[in-house]
Amino acid sequence: FLHVANTKTHTVDRKIGPFSAGVRPFTIDSSETRVFVTVNELLGFEVGDLKSGEKLASVKVLGWDKGPVRRHGNPSHGIGLTPDEKEIWVCDGHNMRMHIFSAQPPYLQQTTIPLSDMPGWVTFSMDGQYAYPSSGEVIHARRREVLYLLKDEHHNTVSSEKMVEIFKKEGKAVANGDQFGVGRLH
């Protein structure tokens, strides 16, 4: 189950699921009606209704096998909803891929992007133009094209699950994103 907590009372308000296994990273849409979760041992994701509490779907990545991973111990540790809420991006650690699905039923698999290393997280620029898997790539989200592989001053790949986007105006921060690939329509 995914437990929804009330932060005023510090109690569990409701449970979503049950899902097929333990819940790993998840993302929600901006209207807080759908949750897309990764679960233990599934190369793919499951969908829950945040209002009714029901599990709605289980979606497997097609054409790829799950296998051993170096980090997180789970084939799909990392999932993001594009800011326009049209796509779900799912990390695949074993195959070093990002799998892209429609965010609407029946959640069709659209394409797969090869990465340079094992992804464990994905987020997007606030405008949705770029995707940032934790493996260090900068991907043009619409074209599904890897534009850059981030490197440090010693030409080592820079990879991280922690990322923040900050917009400045006249030297002052005026807006910021976060490390979570969540819907931003509302």
What are the residue ranges of the model-derived segments?
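Predominantly soluble domains enriched in secretory-pathway, periplasmic, or organellar proteins
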Residues: 1-186
